[in-house]
Amino acid sequence: MLNFYKGKRVFVTGHTGFKGSWLCKILANAGAQVTGYSLNPPTNPNLFEIANIEGDIKSVIGDIRDFDLLKKSFDEAQPEIVLHLAAQPIVRDSYKMPAYTYETNVMGTVNILECVRQSDCVKSFLNVTTDKVYENKEWQWGYRENEPLDGFDPYSNSKSCSELVTHSYKNSFFADGRVAISTARAGNVIGGGDFANDRIIPDCVRALEKGEDIIVRNPHSTRPYQHVLEPLFAYLMIAKAQYEDIKFADYYNVGPDECDCVTTGELVDLFVKYADGKINWINKSEKNDVHEANFLKLDCSKLKSVFGWTPHWHVTEAVEKTVEWSRCYMEKGDVRKCMDKQIEEFLASRI
């Protein structure tokens, strides 16, 4: 699959983030001509700078809400493929900054789709959203792509809106098939290089660095955790397939098998195990905390039936690879080499 991307012009929004940095590394390794458009890296430290991703691509620092700069950068790049990852991605932050969250996640989607609409170079567009776009009914079954879109909190709801914007543009402006448009609704991702606040694995890594207990807010919440490489390669698979044949342009869930949908407490137990048991975790549930879903799974039958896709790593391996990368970073090792190694191992594996 990666041979397809050699020489392809790819425009990635949100390239300085955790997922964006991994994605740009994969594309650069494949020989793609990558232009990234994003705000400055969202954390300090951050994977984008640690792994010197800027040296692999053309990086433009800009706000997805700034249409003029976005359009200028887009027109200069003349992309064939657009992968839209730029977002305000933290649920808890969306309660603090609801207007900013909607501006970024909804109008940001409008802006990038306007760039696509006003161009004649793009053949494939993929909007990356989230498993949280669905109306959460707190049931045990995985949500399918035809379930109602109605995220509860400002982050989740803004991503539901982003889906609807994409659907509208697809129907209104691209019904002639000149651009293949899809969305990908991915489950929770983990992996080396995530330094975000209010995410459980980065919290674990920080606790390991400091030799402190891990604070867990919602140990009984179930999430579709997967290694970051799982959805990234799914995105690239979808973008390639619809580039070659528009019949693949659709809406897809991307998540782990049901056996790998674990509680946050079980995930932290795995982290402690692969960290050689050198840390512990404590439950500090907050009764008056902001609303977050307790039970969330995805049904990924569609992705499997259409593409023959299956996950490469179980959640145990995903956590093990995360700890491996984190140790490399903490011991001041070569994190770029570690990323390349894990990408190669991922491509060589299949559950």
Predicted regions and their residues:
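N-terminal Rossmann-like NAD(P)+-binding domain of SDR-like oxidoreductases, especially those catalyzing
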Residues: 1-186, 329, 346
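Generic structural signal for small/hydrophobic residues in well-ordered secondary structure
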Residues: 5, 15-17, 82, 169, ...
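NAD(P)-dependent short-chain dehydrogenase/reductase
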Residues: 137-142, 146, 154-155, 160-243, ...
